[in-house]
Design a protein with these regions (language model features):
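Alpha-helical transmembrane segments forming the membrane-embedded cores
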Residues: 163-229
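Generic detection of intrinsically disordered/low-complexity segments and helix-coil linkers/edges
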Residues: 15-17, 25, 110, 180, ...
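Long, solvent-exposed extracytoplasmic domains/loops
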Residues: 34-154
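Short, flexible coil/linker elements and helix-boundary hinge sites characteristic
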Residues: 27-28, 43, 195-196
């Protein structure tokens, strides 16, 4: 009876952890470098990283979108026009607080498009990399490409990488089978070779090690799913 109670508690704990993980991993939003901006109930986005706190409001327009982006209390307003009048198709124009900061074209799917400048044919944005925590405040603002992907292209992501769900699920299934049927893998390997044999103490020792390793692997993969994007 005591063993059944312990097993039931373990199962309930595992289910609770699984539900909490899925809830956290599948929360919608969008990545801005290493900051994840969670989608809120009112349609806005907010999040923070080691450098600043961010909020964003997006309003769709007839041929693009308007974005209000706040960084640590400072707000900038962007207007994005796709297929802007007098421009090539698909022409893009982006304004920041009424000043044009980009005109050019978008190549590819809007959610992952490459933006090319009309004047010099170069990419819309410079690549800014924060090294050893050294940065300029201007590096923290969203790039033209990111704004286009999110506001016009409708890019949406989840907090955790869903690519990790398959290996996590596979490990969990193997652990459940090994606990529920302790001799399953031994029988699969030796059942046709040995009749009436028994696993050795070494087998049981390695089985315990594999269970511990598998459990650690599940938590490591779960943690990695939040770090990789």
């Amino acid at each position: 009876m005591e063993k059944k109670t312990s097993c039931l508690l373990c199962v309930l704990t595992a289910l609770l952890l699984a539900v909490l993980y899925l809830w956290a991993a599948l929360r919608p939003g969008v990545w801005l470098r290493d900051a994840f901006l969670y989608r809120q109930a009112d349609g806005s986005f907010s999040g923070r990283d080691a450098y600043a706190a961010y909020t964003m409001q997006i309003a769709q327009t007839e041929n693009g979108a308007e974005v209000e982006f706040t960084l640590d209390g400072e707000t900038r307003r962007y207007r994005l026009e796709s297929k802007a009048e007098g421009m090539s198709d698909p022409g893009v124009k982006i304004e920041q607080d009424g000043v044009v900061i980009f005109t050019g074209t978008a190549l590819g799917d809007p959610g992952d498009a490459i933006l090319w400048r009309e004047d010099d044919g170069g990419l819309a944005d410079e690549v800014n990399v924060i090294v050893n925590g050294e940065y300029r405040r201007s590096d923290l603002w969203p790039s033209c490409s990111w704004l286009y992907h999110v506001a016009v292209g409708g890019r949406r992501e989840t907090r955790g990488s869903v690519a990790f769900l398959l290996p996590i699920g596979a490990l969990v299934v193997l652990l459940v089978l090994d606990v529920r049927f302790p001799l399953l893998f031994w029988n699969l390997r030796h059942g046709l070779e040995v009749y009436g044999g028994e696993p050795t103490d070494w087998y049981y020792a390695m089985q315990r090690v594999s269970r511990i390793t598998g459990t650690i692997g599940v938590f490591v993969l779960a943690a990695m799913s939040f770090a990789v994007h």
